[in-house]
């Protein structure tokens, strides 16, 4: 009489109990602090939600970068007393003319010192500067990656929405937010660059002249919005005294009149700069600007040393919270344009889930009937192992908080058929041994041992394909790959460990004369 391996019994019990605990939140609400309470995340196609395709405005970023480069070049040319004229940015290139071709050598040294990745084109005394292809691609990748991270933080500031963000092509970003019931809110927070800057107000400028286009050199006209006076214009200095890059905290609050405000704090460097600004400009107005729109322009009453401040304006509670969120996560490197928008209703997702349930149930019942008709009692053991495999799949999806999509359901249904493949291989090998006239115990042991290598090889090749789909696929393809991978691992465990254990228990304690396979 054979002895049952204790490690298999213990392992099977532990895995099954753990799987039940992990899968339970999908059926009932768990409030215990000691038990898992996360259920499976449903993808956009099952849960409904918003699907946005964003275009990264790289041309604007490149133009701003070239403008900064042009300013740096002007300072260096003046410093080295090199004469030039008509220095301007056009079509993402810097164009200028030098007064004498003899200064070209010195000019090239200055440009290479500023940025060695700049390509210099020379036509007599006319110079054209542009980024090299490698620098252009590096900047593009940097801007897209930064945009993806900022979008992720804006959309999922609490870490509970599970958005899907994928780069598509050179400068497109696909954003999917399952369960989003307010796509207009998403469009609002993504449509703002959230570039916060501090400027001094140009008190000497004439507003009426500025509106007509006569803006003093070094200043600019911007628009504000007052609760009491409506829209109005103000002239501010172009020079940025301080930017939102130094902010560490931002939160919505209320002032003494119960009006919504945004409170903020700077880091050490920002606090020092802010203190110097307020100390040196007491009595002047400090304009707080967001995306070239005036938020407020309070009078500086004295030095502010602590690095804390407030932004007042025509805020509602919602807009104050929204601005605080945008300031906390930081500004986008460049504007984003929404070029495609789709909303998937929850009813469509519910229909997909119901169809998936029906297909899965039909497939499961058909497989179970086939196994019992073909293999009798041990076919029933394969069905029990199949049920446990489905339990393990459900538990692992819940444990890893994987997102289940419609293709993922297809992967699970496919796993139902694949799960019994291993059992079929084993049972057919057992049949071959029984035809040789050997004992039941020997046939079972030999059948499992001889089929083991084949089962491992076939499943490993499928896993390789699943990994490739996950690495190179996007969206729904990844969901299919995840479900397929988890399904393969679960079915291998149930077929090799669970089925063998059930058959061993049956043979040891019930001592059947025949296995019903002949």
UniProtKB/Swiss-Prot annotation:
Membrane topology annotation:
Multi-pass membrane protein
Its domain of life?
Bacteria
InterPro entries according to UniProt: SecD (IPR005791), SecD/SecF_arch_bac (IPR022813), SecD_1st (IPR048631), SecD_SecF_C (IPR048634), SecD_SecF_C_bact (IPR055344), SecDF_P1_head (IPR054384)
Q: Does the keyword Transmembrane helix apply?
A: yes
| Signal sequence bounds | none
Transmembrane regions listed in the UniProt entry: 9-29, 356-376, 377-397, 406-426, 463-483, 486-506
Q: State the compartments where it is located.
A: Cell inner membrane
- Keywords, comma-separated and alphabetical: Cell inner membrane, Cell membrane, Membrane, Protein transport, Translocation, Transmembrane, Transmembrane helix, Transport
State one molecular function term (GO).
protein-transporting ATPase activity
Please list the GO biological process terms of this entry.
Answer: intracellular protein transmembrane transport; protein targeting; protein transport by the Sec complex
Give the CC-aspect GO terms. plasma membrane
Cystine connections: none
Report the Pfam families cross-referenced here: SecD_1st (PF21760), SecD_SecF_C (PF02355), SecDF_P1_head (PF22599)
Q: Does the keyword Repressor apply?
A: no
Q: What is its main location?
A: membrane
**Which SUPFAM superfamilies does the UniProt record give?**
Multidrug efflux transporter AcrB transmembrane domain (SSF82866)
Query: Can you state the subunit structure given in the record?
Result: Forms a complex with SecF. Part of the essential Sec protein translocation apparatus which comprises SecA, SecYEG and auxiliary proteins SecDF-YajC and YidC.
Q: What does this protein do?
A: Part of the Sec protein translocase complex. Interacts with the SecYEG preprotein conducting channel. SecDF uses the proton motive force (PMF) to complete protein translocation after the ATP-dependent function of SecA.
Family that this chain belongs to = Belongs to the SecD/SecF family. SecD subfamily.
Kindly give the HAMAP family that the UniProt entry links to this protein: SecD_B
This protein is called what?
A: Protein translocase subunit SecD
């Amino acid at each position: 009489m054979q002895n049952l391996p204790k490690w298999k019994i213990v392992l099977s019990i532990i895995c099954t109990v753990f799987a039940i605990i992990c899968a339970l939140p999908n059926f009932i609400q768990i409030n215990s602090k000691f038990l898992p309470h996360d259920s499976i995340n449903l993808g956009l196609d099952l849960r409904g939600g918003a699907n946005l395709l964003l275009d990264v405005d790289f041309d604007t970023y490149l133009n701003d970068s070239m403008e900064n480069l042009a300013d740096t070049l002007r300072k260096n040319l003046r410093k080295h007393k090199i004469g030039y004229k008509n220095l301007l940015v056009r079509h993402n290139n810097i164009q200028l003319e030098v007064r004498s071709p003899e200064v070209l050598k010195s000019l090239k040294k200055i440009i290479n010192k500023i940025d060695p990745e700049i390509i210099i084109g020379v036509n007599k005394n006319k110079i054209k500067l542009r980024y090299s292809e490698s620098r252009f691609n590096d900047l593009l990748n940097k801007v897209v990656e930064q945009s993806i991270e900022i979008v992720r933080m804006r959309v999922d500031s609490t870490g509970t929405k599970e958005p899907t963000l994928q780069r598509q092509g050179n400068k497109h970003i696909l954003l999917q937010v399952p369960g989003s019931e307010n796509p207009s809110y998403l469009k609002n927070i993504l449509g703002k660059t959230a570039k916060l800057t501090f400027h001094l107000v140009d008190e000497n400028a004439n507003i009426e002249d500025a509106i007509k286009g006569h803006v003093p050199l070094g200043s600019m006209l911007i628009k504000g919005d007052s609760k009491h006076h409506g829209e109005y214009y103000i002239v501010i200095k172009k020079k940025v005294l301080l930017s939102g890059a130094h902010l560490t905290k931002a939160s919505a609050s209320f002032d003494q009149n119960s009006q919504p405000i945004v409170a903020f704090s700077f880091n050490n460097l920002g606090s020092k700069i802010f203190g110097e600004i307020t100390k040196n400009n007491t009595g002047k107005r400090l304009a707080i600007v967001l995306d070239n729109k005036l938020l407020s322009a309070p009078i500086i009453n004295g030095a502010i040393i602590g690095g804390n401040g407030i932004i007042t304006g025509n805020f509602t509670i919602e807009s104050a919270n929204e601005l605080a969120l945008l300031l906390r996560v930081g500004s986008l490197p460049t504007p984003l344009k929404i070029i495609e928008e789709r909303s998937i209703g929850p009813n469509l997702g519910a229909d997909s889930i119901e169809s998936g349930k029906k297909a899965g149930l039909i497939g499961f019942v058909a497989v179970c009937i086939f196994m019992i008709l073909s293999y009798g009692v041990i076919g029933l053991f394969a069905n029990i192992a199949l049920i446990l495999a489905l339990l393990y799949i459900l538990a692992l999806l819940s444990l890893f908080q994987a997102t289940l999509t419609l293709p993922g359901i297809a992967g699970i249904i496919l796993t139902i058929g694949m799960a019994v493949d291993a059992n079929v291989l084993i049972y057919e090998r057992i049949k071959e041994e029984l035809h040789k006239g050997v004992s039941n115990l020997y046939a079972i042991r030999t059948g499992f041992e001889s089929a083991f290598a084949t089962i491992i090889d076939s499943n490993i090749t499928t896993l390789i394909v699943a990994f490739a789909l996950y690495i190179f696929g996007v969206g729904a393809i990844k969901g299919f790959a995840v479900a397929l991978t988890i399904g393969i691992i679960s079915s291998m465990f149930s077929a090799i460990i669970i089925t063998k254990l059930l058959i061993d228990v049956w043979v040891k304690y019930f001592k059947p004369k025949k296995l019903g396979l002949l």
